[in-house]
Structure formats: C-alpha cells, structure tokens
Curated annotation (Swiss-Prot):
Keyword Transmembrane helix carried by entry: yes
Lineage of source species: Bacteria, Pseudomonadati, Pseudomonadota, Gammaproteobacteria, Pasteurellales
Protein name: Putative permease HI_0125
InterPro entries referenced in this protein's UniProt entry, alphabetically: Azg-like, NCS2
Family recorded in the similarity comment: Belongs to the nucleobase:cation symporter-2 (NCS2) (TC 2.A.40) family. Azg-like subfamily.
Positions contributing to ATP binding: G315, T316, A317, A318, G319, G320, K321, T322
Membrane topology: Multi-pass membrane protein
Naturally occurring in which organism (per UniProt): Haemophilus influenzae (strain ATCC 51907 / DSM 11121 / KW20 / Rd)
Localization: Cell membrane
Keywords linked to the UniProt accession: ATP-binding, Cell membrane, Membrane, Nucleotide-binding, Transmembrane, Transmembrane helix, Transport
Amino acid sequence: MPTLEKTFELKQRGSTVRQEIIAGLTTFLAMVYSVIVVPNMLGAAGFPAESVFIATCLVAGLGSILIGLWANAPMAIGCAISLTAFTAFSLVIGQKVAIPVALGAVFLMGVVFTLISTTGIRAWILRNLPSNIAHGAGIGIGLFLLLIAANGVGLVVSNQAGLPVKLGDFTSFPVMMSLIGLALIIGLEKMKIKGGILWVIIAITIVGLIFDPNVKFGGEIFKMPTFGENSLFLQLDFMGALQPAILPVVFALVMTAVFDATGTIRAVAGQADLLDKDGQIINGGKALTSDSISSLFSGLFGTAPAAVYIESAAGTAAGGKTGITAIVVGVLFLLMLFFQPLAFLVPGYATAPALMYVGLLMLSNVSKLDFDDFVGAMSGLICAVFIVLTANIVTGIMLGFAALVIGRIVSGDIKRLNVGTVIIAIVLVAFYAGGWAI
C-alpha cells in the first residue's frame, strides 16, 4: 500500500498498516464505554438519550477521522467525560440552564477554542493561566465525577441534617455492583487488559439482566440510527450562550479544554515518539485545532464537548504512530451507530465504576502541583476543593484565581503575577460580585 505509506509516513515512523489497525482497535475498546456513559449522564439532565447516543458516536467518529487525516496523529477524539459531567450536573441540573443554551455554550466554546488554537491568543492564555490552577481544576473535576457516580448509585446520598451528604444503603444491589466493578476495573487496568473498562460494563450488565428485574432486554440488537422526535440536532441557542451569566461557563470550558487537550496530546505524542528535537508536538497545532473543531460538532449534533481521550495512549502503547490509528477508531464509532439498543440496555450502576475510575485518574493531578510555590499550590487546592463543595467548576476556578492574586500580594511575591492573570481574576470576581454568574 504505497499510497498509505507515503500519506501517513508509515516507514518514516516505523509502523505498518496492520500495526495501525491493531492500535486503532485497542484504542476503540479502551474508550467505547463513552457511548454508554455520555448518554446516561446527559439523560439524567433531560437530554434525549437516543439523540445523544447518535451525536456522541458522530462526534467521536468524525473527530477521530479529522485528527487522523489532517494531523496524522494516533489520537482519538470523543465527548470528554469531565465536561459531560459539567454540562449535565453543574450547568443544566445545578444552574437550571436550558438545554439549547447549554449546547450554545458548547458551540461557543468550540469557536473560541478553535480561534485560540489557530492564533497567538492560545499562547497568551497559556502564559496567564497558572498551571497550578489548571491542575487544581483537574483534581476538582475528578472529585466531582466521583461524587456524581457515587450519588447516582446511592452510595452517597443527601443528608437532611448535619453535613450535606451521608453514606447510602451500602448493601443495595447497585452500590455493591458499582464497588465490585470499580475494583475489577482497577485490577484489569493494572494487568493492562485491553478494553478492561468495557468488559466490566458488559459483565455487570449481564449480571443485571439475570438478577435485576429493572434491566430488561427488548430483543433488538441492530437499529437504523435516527435522532428521534426529540432530536437536539441544530437545536443550540447560540444567542442565549452570549448572555453575561453564561460567559463564565464558556470560560471554564475553554480553560479546561486548553490545558486538558494540550496535556493529553503531549502525553500521547510523547509515548508515540512524535515530539520534535525541541520537545514540541509534531503537527501539534493541527491536532489541537482538530480537537477544538470537534466541539463545534458537539454543539451542532447535541452532545457534550469533545476532547482527545487519554485512552489514546492504549493505542500508542500497542504500536500506533500515525493517523491511521485514529481513522480506524473513527470508523468503528460510526459503525456503533447501528448498535444503539445494546447501549440503552446498560444500567447506571454498570457505568458508575467507569466514572469513578476516570475520576480517580484525574486525582493524579495532585502530583503535578508545584508545592515549592506554596501560594500557587494552595490556590490550586482551593480551586479543587471548592469545585466539589459547590458542585460548580467555575466557582472553584474563580476562588482559585482570587486566592492566587491575593496570596501573591500579601506574601510580597507580586512579581510572579502576570497582568493577564490579574485581569482574568478581576473579571471572574466581578461576574460573581455583580450577580451575573450562575
């Protein structure tokens, strides 16, 4: 296949078509759980699950094919679990934002992220958004995911007196299945079993079919994809997303995307040996832009923001070095469109372990905090803690920025403050002080 070898630089990167196909299948198995988890999470917020399933498959399929063809990168794109949680539980449920407005915010985030990925604005933002705050946001979102998953199965429930939450019914079937599932995922991932998360979801679903009367198989396996009567396709309210109260949400989405995408893409590129002599990502600009364009797809199709999946590392570990890996992933997600009935068979307690596991992985950001910079590290932890305590990502980020600026001034370390950081902090605090934040 000389054309493929030349187009995707197979020989130059030390790979083969067969190796790339195996890598693509490996990545797909590692992240296909998203087409089950994302509709379940957004469905809890009132999104029509059938429409979200199709949109999620389309975003993952088209986004992965785009980054494979354009950036020649072995990275797969899908709806980010952390941003799905933010969209569903913080934005729509917690802050009562209408679903079309939420989709408008997702689309606007995609527009802004695309612009900053193709101009010098991204470099300015990266210079002025402290890494400790970014890592703190990652920790907070991880804790938020853990809380959402634990609450969803009844492990943690609201408390009528005293502290806000308490232990639920520990012996209930959903709780026991979730905890067993989490332990299984951790064990399988330790053993580097490909598709471990998916296999656990399937196993718990089968157990549910046998022992849980609420889980029923309708007899269908294949179904022609249709958005359904309650389709969210092109239902975004872009003008609604431009309201002052919604703009902090867009900022939070953009900030998370900037740091998460850059960190994930760099990590995967490093594993695939796709860094140049200066340590920069080969075709990094195209990869980041592909990532941001995929969030435009999300807003248009009606699902959560997109991002490069860290599970792409499973494929690069299997030998993926070119865009063929990503294209294989994209094609497989498009084929998933025809297996919709199987996705809706999965109970919430089967996907909860996956959410808990992703949340635990995000807590690894603690190791990235620079504790030699005491004020910065504490500001990052303030950001993390208040994201979960307020169930609001933007609030945590605002408090983190405010603590950083005030802490620098009080400690006499004002020289470490960038003008841009101060501007961002003032804008965020003003949004809250003015009552415009949601």
